[in-house]
A protein has these predicted regions:
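Conserved short alpha-helical segments that host acidic/polar catalytic motifs at enzyme active sites
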Residues: 1-251, 255, 267-300, 339, ...
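Structural motif
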Residues: 69, 97, 301-303, 351, ...
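Extended hydrophobic-aromatic, low-complexity segments
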Residues: 186, 313-315, 330-332, 362-365, ...
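Generic C-terminus detector
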Residues: 258, 551, 564-566, 576-617
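Active-site phosphate/pyrophosphate-binding segments
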Residues: 265-269, 273-303, 395-524, 597-617
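Glycine-rich phosphate-binding loops that contact phosphosugars or nucleotide phosphates
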Residues: 297-441, 445-448, 528-569, 592, ...
């Protein structure tokens, strides 16, 4: 959830690289930032402050920021309030060491108590300071090398971590370690880079090593990258080549990343379908289904595990798979699944689909490990190539929508739904559970989605005007049925994430079982009321809302003349198959949330208290 950056080399000053890296990681969410640098005089300088990276830059403007080795961090508070004192890096008591850390040390209180009894003092409320004090204590008392002290300390630690450590007595070395929290090492010519993901690294090198759980990396000037485990057994990490276009992690003329990513969706869907959807041959090809045909064809049950927006995509996947493959599907919050003693295993013909944009979502990764331990076959749907979930699964499909920087997911959602649609079509065709005519019709419609979304994006100005009308609403209700119900959930989530307006998504038919009590002139209701599905039923719901003075924004099929007469505002969508409607209907809801948040003056790309990649529980 926080951001880690590191640099060691002889060619460049570390500070500019660290600051630029932190800026690349701002999308992950944070409340404070800091850097640690070793200068040529072997002084270890730590500078940190509450607030944004820009605040850190201002704080450092009159400080000694020289040096070719350094680490930097953006913090999202878990232990201790957001403050300069609790910000990272943390010194050890001797001030020989500085550490940055993502994750949670679960037994920090016990370790801290023991260290206090041994005479150690603490400056912050964080679990991270406990870890650096432990390393310092071990190193001093046992007269060990930094690596040995780190290994012994990590042996005592319970919890998740990604850490990077500097020692002013060893200014030519950075040590980093990982357990259940992502960490990437970039390898340059005589220099090393470090990041929570590849985005702070790719400007300087495309050669990276994704550290696995239990890995400890030693980056030392003049030497090759060394990776060992806690027992000091040397490992042979795979050096990968990453392909990230720098333009994808810059705004490119848009005021916010979120708006850029909304407008990128037509191209993203083309990228997602390239080489997979062949409308000219009416065929969908997924390598994972070819390589694991028998396992997937023999599935008796599919369990989808995900969190947040990915969970909403999973709900759409459930309907697609059940409709076309005739396989029962259950959709679980990964956080509930992992602790719920689920009945899952290979003996029951279970396939578990794990969905995560980052591929690092802690609860989803834990759910994967649990299902795997019980013998289930695991299929991953992720965006970040080389991330932890794809490496933990049996097979899977990348959505290929490029880096998503805005905290509120947009293009990743439509990418996930596109992959789930392709998965359902390919599996249904292999099973023979879909007619040839229907199969061809859905493929043709899917291939047309990029141009359909381009058409919907033309409503941007209309939606911006509409947003101004509802800027001061305190609550919203979103309604949908069938395939549109998960879209209603996603629309409500987008609004609450970035505008801080309370919003709920509900099945339209359930309105009378509670939510209708909330309807009055102060309650805007967004209703998805296209000609697909249960049009007449949703129209009746809208009439019930209007009878109670509710204000209705309706998403309707192009040319609808009935609902437009009773709704306060309508947004027209092109006609399409019901199963493809989520890909299109979600776009105006993304735009509505975006424009309301902008009107309210909110930080759209970095909403409060949220992180892009949730790598802790």
């Amino acid at each position: 959830m926080c951001g880690i950056v590191g640099y060691i080399g002889t060619k460049r000053e570390a500070y500019p690289i660290l600051i630029k890296g932190l800026q690349r990681l701002e999308y992950r969410g944070y409340d404070s930032a800091g850097v640690a640098l070793i200068n040529k005089g072997r002084e270890l300088n730590v500078y940190k402050t509450k607030g944004k990276v820009a605040d850190l830059e201002e704080f450092c403007s009159d400080k000694d920021i020289t040096g070719n080795v350094g680490i930097a961090h953006t913090r999202w508070a878990t232990h201790g309030e957001p403050s300069s004192l609790n910000a990272h890096p943390h010194y050890s008591q001797s001030k020989n060491l500085a550490i940055i850390h993502n994750g949670i040390i679960e037994n920090y209180a016990e370790i801290k108590h023991n260290l206090i009894e041994k005479g150690m003092t603490f400056q912050s409320e964080t679990d991270t300071e406990v870890l650096v004090q432990l390393i310092d204590y071990i190193q001093t008392k046992k007269k060990l090398s930094l690596l040995e002290a780190v290994q012994l300390a990590l042996y005592q630690v319970i919890g998740a971590y990604a850490i990077a450590i500097l020692d002013k007595r060893n200014p030519d070395t950075i040590i980093a370690a990982r357990k259940q929290s992502p960490l990437v090492v970039g390898i340059g010519d005589g220099e090393f880079f470090l990041g929570s993901d590849a985005s702070p690294i790719v400007e300087f090198t495309d050669k990276v090593v994704y550290l696995d759980d239990g890995n400890i990396a030693v980056m030392k000037l003049g030497e090759e990258l060394k990776v060992v485990n806690i027992l000091n057994e040397e490992l042979s990490p795979e050096v990968r080549t990453v392909d990230i276009n720098l333009g994808e992690i810059e705004k490119g003329g848009f005021p916010h990343f979120m708006l850029k990513e909304i407008f990128a969706q037509p191209q993203c869907l083309k990228n997602c379908m390239r080489g997979r959807v062949h409308p000219e041959h009416t065929q969908v090809t997924l390598r994972a289904l070819i390589d694991h045909r028998d396992k997937l064809l023999n599935a008796k049950r599919i369990i989808i595990v995900a969190c947040g927006t990915s969970w909403h995509a999973g709900l759409i996947g459930k309907q697609l798979i059940e409709e076309y493959c005739r396989i029962p599907v259950q959709v679980e919050y990964a956080s509930e699944f992992r602790y719920g003693n689920p009945v899952v295993g290979d003996g029951d013909g279970d396939v578990v689909i794990a969905i995560s944009q980052s591929g690092e979502t802690a609860d989803t990764l834990a759910a994967v490990e649990l299902a795997k331990s019980k013998g289930a076959f695991i299929y991953g749907i992720c965006n970040a190539i080389g991330s932890s979930i794809p490496r933990a699964t049996d097979t899977g499909t990348y959505i290929h929508v490029g880096p998503e920087i805005g905290v509120a997911s947009t293009k990743a959602f439509t990418g996930q739904v596109t992959v789930l649609t392709m998965f359902a079509l390919a599996l249904a065709n292999a099973k023979g559970s879909i007619s040839g005519g229907e199969y061809n019709k859905v493929i043709k419609g899917l291939a047309e989605m990029p141009s359909v979304i381009e058409e919907v994006l033309k409503t941007n100005d209309q939606i911006a005007d509409l947003a101004r009308t509802f800027t001061y609403a305190r609550n919203f209700l979103y309604l949908g049925r069938g395939y549109s119900y998960p879209v209603a959930l996603e629309g409500a989530l987008k609004l609450k994430e970035i505008s801080y307006i309370h919003a709920e998504g509900y099945p339209a038919a359930e309105m009378k079982h509670g939510p209708i009590a909330l309807i009055d002139s102060d309650m805007p209701v967004v209703a998805i009321a296209t000609h697909n599905g249960m049009y007449e039923k949703v129209r009746s719901n809208i009439q019930e809302i209007k009878a109670r003075q509710g204000r209705v924004i309706a998403l309707v099929s192009k040319g609808d003349t009935t609902i437009s007469k009773i709704a306060d505002a309508v947004i027209e969508l092109p006609d399409m198959m019901e199963c493809l409607e989520p890909l299109v209907a979600t776009v105006p809801l993304q735009l509505l949330a975006y424009h309301i948040a902008v009107c309210k003056g909110k930080d759209v790309d970095q909403p409060r208290n949220l992180a892009k990649s949730v790598t802790v529980e």
